[in-house]
Amino acid sequence: MASFLKISTLIAIVSTLQTTLAAPPACLLACVAKVEKGSKCSGLNDLSCICTTKNSDVEKCLKEICPNGDADTAISAFKSSCSGYSSQSSSSESESESASSEESSASASASASSSAGKSSNVEASTTKESSSAKASSSAAGSSEAVSSATETASTEESSSAAASASASASATKESSSEAASSTSSTLKESKTSTTAAASSSESTTATGVLTQSEGSAAKVGLGALVGLVGAVLL
């Protein structure tokens, strides 16, 4: 169906060109058919579509494939065939431009409204952020104060602990000194007792030796006396 419409449209274009120009160049027909085939123009408005949207493509094709003498003739024939559609194209373009300007105005209004809304949102967000920042700074100040108080208390506790440790060390040194002194005194007394005991033992031993010597001498004297008496009696 689409191919039939294109063929019928091409026939209509050829007949239009023939009424405009008695004998249109063959290259003109070839270029119109080529451009119409590669474009989106279809239906009964093919010639209008080609004249308004593809006229530059047709002229370029004519300059490329038409002989030198036929190119200008073909371009003139194409322009004369599209003369009625060019005025329609101008009115369509003006309508499109007015519609575009209206759309631009509407877009500008919408953009302005959107910008105003965004500005309000930004201001509200900025206010909230300021409040949040103040609350955060207050909380940070409170936290710093608590931290400072905690550090002070920790420092005081550390000082007290250090003082207690120093006192304990002093007490330990004094106890060690007293224990050393007591041990030294005990050792001295023990040495003195040992010396006295040794002296007493030596004295006792000497006395025993002297007593034993004296007993032996008495026994010897008594024996001599008994012998002397026995000799006298004999």
From Swiss-Prot:
Chain residues that bind heme: 46
Broad class of where this protein is predominantly found: secreted
Compositional bias ranges of the Low complexity kind: 86-207
GO MF entry, a single one: metal ion binding
Start and end residues of each stretch annotated as Disordered: 86-208
Role this protein plays: Beta-glucan associated cell wall protein involved in cell wall structure. May serve as cross-linking or coat-forming wall protein.
Name of the protein described by the UniProt record: Covalently-linked cell wall protein 14
Gene: SSR1
